Amino acid sequence: MSFRLFNGDAMKQFTLPLDKERQRPTLYLKSFFGLSAMLDTGAVLPVWVEDEELLQNMGAIKIAKNQPFGGFGGMTTGTLYRIPLFRCGDLMFPELPIIASRSELSCQMILSATMFSGLIYEIDDFHHKFNVTIPDTESIIRKLIIEDSNGKLHILCSGEEM
């Protein structure tokens, strides 16, 4: 992690490489079993698109089946899991909620925009980098909470210090 001054404020910053061979912004999560993840700035929930058995083998805990959620161009259903500790670069997500919904993508998971709520992030397609800046008002420890509102799942994100 490096530190930069933005408007006189020192902010933490890190950069992850994007896969140069893919048209969609995809990164490899060295800190999470080396899996690949696509960044989706329109996604509300993180989504596991690979086999659920693999997710369970990595320690994820099944919470509920047949959960309706919006995505992939409409409403669908999936199984809600919690990953005990998920890392993306310098960010840590304890008890990360993730929906498992099999899809034919060339990655194992989709990282949602809500995971980076309150942060400054840039998908630099020219240099193939994902740059994340963490303002002093935010933490590297991110807490995502899924709430059910009238049968629709939505997610809240807060940075919390441990």
Which ranges hold each PLM region?
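Pepsin/retropepsin-fold aspartyl endopeptidases
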Residues: 1-162
